[in-house]
A protein has these predicted regions:
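Tandem repeat scaffolds
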Residues: 1-192
Length: 192
């Protein structure tokens, strides 16, 4: 597949492999990626607009400084995927497996993570303007220097997240989740 054209509009890519390629400054408008598997792929300074990724294995892919606007990732494997320094505007992640995914230094605007496994994912120094997490799994997920103020995590499974006390100031959780945050506040509970 040749993505090195300047602008790809209304293209569909299905049942294919992408191996050992770097794509630079390509624009993807209203494209569909269905059942695509990647290995050693890098997208640098690319723009994805109204694009859908369905049942793709994008594990270990690198999206370097990319812009995603009105994009959906549906039932995708994003194991170890690197989105660092990218921007998300009206992006939806549905039922995605995001173990070890790197969202560091991303700028999120109206981003939804819906039923995603974000275990050991990294959201370091991430801006989360109107970011929502619904029914996500967050085990050892890192939110260092990523303020969670007014972010609702009440429907998520949370265990041993990594964050500074100021990062969790104002986070919205339910009563049962409070024990997952005690260690962040340096509070000790005396056992019975």
């Amino acid at each position: 597949m040749d993505f090195n054209e300047n602008k790809l509009i209304n293209q569909t890519y299905e049942n294919n492999w992408l191996i050992e390629e770097t794509y630079q400054q390509s624009d993807f408008h209203q494209c569909h990626f269905n059942n695509i598997t990647t290995q050693d792929i890098v997208f640098e300074h690319c723009y994805f607009y109204q694009t859908m990724f369905n049942q793709c294995d994008l594990s270990n892919i690198k999206f370097d400084n990319c812009m995603f606007r009105q994009v959906q990732f549906n039932n995708c494997k994003l194991l170890g995927s690197d989105f660092s320094e990218s921007s998300f505007d009206q992006v939806i992640f549905n039922d995605c497996l995001c173990h070890f995914a790197n969202f560091s230094f991303t700028r999120n605007k109206e981003t939804l993570f819906n039923r995603c496994d974000l275990s050991q994912a990294i959201f370091q120094d991430t801006t989360m303007n109107k970011t929502k997490y619904k029914e996500c799994r967050m085990i050892q997920t890192s939110f260092l220097h990523a303020p969670l103020k007014n972010i609702d995590l009440s429907t998520c499974l949370i265990e041993a997240i990594e964050a500074a006390p100021q990062d969790v100031n104002g986070v919205i959780i339910d009563e049962m989740q409070s024990s997952a945050f005690i260690h962040l506040l340096n509070i000790k509970i005396k056992g019975a």
